[in-house]
Amino acid sequence: MTVIKMPKQSNGTVHSSKDLRQLIDYVINPEKTNDFEYVSGQNILDVHSTCDEMLATRTMANTLKNKPRKNERFGYHFVQSFSPDDHLTPEQVHEIGLKTMKEYLGSSAEFIIATHTDKPHLHNHIVLNATNPLTLNKFQQNKNDLERLKEISDRISKEYGCKIIVRPEQKLGNSHKNYLVYLAKNSYRKEIKN
């Protein structure tokens, strides 16, 4: 059973260089990743200098685009968890995570992925640079994108024999038209007139 999400406490966003450094230090912790065996990245030269590389990309974007930004997002944090019942190896979990993120983000994104093996359930932590190193644009994501990420994760996980959580179809809020129909049927004005 595979679940991919953004942590609730931060809503998956990193808002400072200090937080980015702390997050990356936690994610690549050698005690959790079997001495960095299950740590890799895309468009990262050295996983040990990931934070510096991501901050350099951000600085370059701000300089070249001449748009220094304040209170912006420095990165995004995703967690992809697997059930012990799926009997996956750490290598397989890491591979699933890499394939998922490469398909979701494309080849130009800058991210690091680390598979934590310190708990009974194996899980990937992914830290994505909010600034794309090739386009120098910011990463944009909406609810539909997160659903697309979940679908990609489910499909790739299924290829490795993982059980998939069946998600109920998402209910969208009432449309304005439905709201007007409801008001017409349930108007308090009729009650006042009577």
Predicted regions, residues:
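N-terminal nicking endonuclease/strand-transfer module with a His-rich metal-binding environment
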Residues: 1-194
